[in-house]
C-alpha cells in the first residue's frame, strides 16, 4: 500500500546508490567494466533484439502467476504487441532482417524492354532508419551486414549506422580469429519443404 510502497522504493533507491558506489570503487581499482557493471545490472534498462519462430511456451511460462513480476510485465506488453501485429510471411529466398525493411516491386516485361505483363517481384532492401526511396536500396548482402551490425550494437548504438560502419562491425564479428556469431542468429530465411 501507499506507505509500504514508498518504503520499498526508498530501499530500492538506496540499494541502487550503494551498487553505483561499489561499482565506482571497483572501477577505480582497475577491475574490468564487464565485472563492475554486473553490480548495477538489476537497476539498468536494456535494449535487446529477440527473434523466434514460436512464442507459445515462452508466453505460457512468463505470463504464469508465479513468474517474476518484471518479466511478466514485459511478457504481457510483448503479447499485446504481437497480438496486434500482422506478421510478414516470408517466401523462399526472403530474409528476416531486423533493422532492414524490404520493398516488393512488381517487375513487368516492359521493364526489360518488351511487352507489358507482370513477371514477378524484385525485392529491394532498405535501412529502416533512413530514406526509403528506391535510390537508397541495399543489396541482400548489404542488408544482411547492416542487420547483423545493428543487432550486434543494439545495446549502445545511436541511430547512426551506415554501410561503412556495418562493414567494419561485420568484419570484427565474422572475420576475426574468434568469431562472435550470436548477432547472426537473428537473420533467418524459411526452410521450404524440409520436413
Label the model's feature ranges.
Residues 1-195:
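A conserved ligand/cofactor-binding region detector
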Amino acid at each position: 500500500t501507499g506507505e509500504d510502497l514508498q518504503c520499498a522504493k526508498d530501499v530500492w533507491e538506496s540499494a541502487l546508490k550503494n551498487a553505483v558506489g561499489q561499482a565506482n570503487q571497483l572501477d577505480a581499482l582497475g577491475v574490468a567494466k564487464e565485472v563492475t557493471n554486473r553490480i548495477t545490472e538489476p537497476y539498468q534498462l536494456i535494449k535487446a533484439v529477440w527473434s523466434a519462430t514460436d512464442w507459445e511456451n515462452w508466453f505460457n511460462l512468463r505470463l504464469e502467476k508465479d513468474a517474476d513480476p518484471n518479466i511478466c510485465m514485459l511478457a504481457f506488453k510483448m503479447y499485446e504487441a504481437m497480438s496486434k501485429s500482422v506478421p510478414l510471411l516470408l517466401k523462399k529466398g526472403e530474409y528476416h532482417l531486423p533493422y532492414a525493411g524490404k520493398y516488393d516491386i512488381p517487375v513487368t516485361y516492359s521493364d526489360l524492354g518488351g511487352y507489358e505483363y507482370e513477371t514477378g517481384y524484385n525485392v529491394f532492401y532498405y535501412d529502416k532508419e533512413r530514406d526509403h526511396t528506391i535510390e537508397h536500396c541495399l543489396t541482400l548482402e548489404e542488408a544482411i551486414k547492416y542487420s547483423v551490425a545493428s543487432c550486434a550494437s543494439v545495446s549502445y548504438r545511436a541511430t547512426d549506422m551506415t554501410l561503412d560502419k556495418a562493414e567494419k562491425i561485420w568484419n570484427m564479428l565474422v572475420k576475426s580469429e574468434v568469431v562472435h556469431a550470436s548477432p547472426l542468429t537473428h537473420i533467418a530465411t524459411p526452410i521450404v519443404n524440409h520436413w
